[in-house]
Regions:
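N-terminal Rossmann-like dinucleotide-binding module
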Residues: 15-88, 168, 236
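Conserved SAM-binding strand-loop segment of SAM-dependent methyltransferases
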Residues: 92-96
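N-terminal Rossmann-like NAD(P) cofactor-binding module of classical short-chain dehydrogenase/reductase
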Residues: 109-110
Length: 267
């Protein structure tokens, strides 16, 4: 099988950063991608578990990747499957993710289901010998995150998550500058994310409310902190290269009094 390597210099050039040492000091996980191999005849046979709005957004990119073959779709909501088939018309359809994992020909899965379901699916996928991309946030609790990490380590399978800022050239460049001391000593960081929408999606029937608007209910979601603020919190830890020792926060439902039970504002 023929391999065409992309040089580290070209890889870094594409990020707009000149020095490998500085880059990898700021973003050490990129070392795994510093020599990318283009294979001539192999594709990753991928299953999408949860091809809802986020899953289909990712499918839009994957469908253009010549090294990916989306071979399976799994969802309990028929309209999601119907829309996903427009992007992957030859994919096999499933209603139970466990049946997907039984298919030995599938190399990897992409998990874009409600947060509360991530851990079980990911653990089962590792046990089935699959590589995993799991959308953020990874787990419903810290204990779940630890279990998934340990399973990843014990199985040796690839585990990737959707914290996209880690690969955003703008953030990588900013961290390079921060860690190089360009702005002096960093004593405080303030991050913001403002949205003025109600975070709701229309439902065809009231009995589908929690299935479709799962982000609004504590049974399935941790609300704004895991669905949006996780990106901002990551920036702080990345910039300071530290994990917080203490955390204080507050939130409330002050505007969208529509039956949701997660806060509509947090800080």
């Amino acid at each position: 099988m023929k391999h065409t390597p992309i040089s580290r210099r070209d890889f870094l050039k594409n990020l707009g950063i000149a020095g490998a040492g500085t880059l990898l000091a700021a973003s050490p996980w990129l070392s795994a991608f510093s020599e990318v191999m283009n294979t001539s005849n192999e594709k990753c046979r991928l299953a999408i578990i949860g091809p809802g709005s986020r899953g289909r957004f990712l499918m839009g990119f994957l469908a253009k990747n010549p090294k990916v073959d989306i071979v399976a779709l799994c969802d309990i909501y028929k309209p999601s499957i119907e829309n996903a088939l427009k992007l992957a018309p030859n994919a096999k359809v499933y209603g139970d993710y466990r049946e997907v994992l039984e298919d030995k020909s599938i190399d990897a899965i992409l998990v874009a289901t409600p947060l509360s379901s991530h851990c079980k699916i990911v653990l089962d996928a590792f046990d089935a010998g699959k590589h995993v991309f799991c959308e953020k946030s990874i787990g419903f609790t810290m204990e779940e995150c630890y279990r998934m990490y340990q399973k990843h380590r014990s199985t040796g399978k690839i585990f990737f998550t959707g914290q996209q800022r880690l690969f955003d050239p703008r953030y990588i460049k900013a961290m390079e500058m921060i860690h190089a001391g360009t702005f002096g000593e960093i004593n405080a960081i303030r991050t913001f994310w403002n949205r003025n929408g109600d975070w709701r999606r229309s439902v065809p029937s009231p009995n589908l409310e929690r299935l479709i608007n799962w982000r609004l209910y504590k049974e399935f979601s941790k609300g704004l902190m895991t669905e949006l603020a996780c990106h901002q919190l990551q920036i702080g830890s990345w910039a300071l290269r530290k994990i917080p020792e203490k955390v204080m926060g507050h939130g409330a439902i002050t505007y969208w009094k529509d039956g949701r039970d997660v806060y509509d504002n947090v800080s």
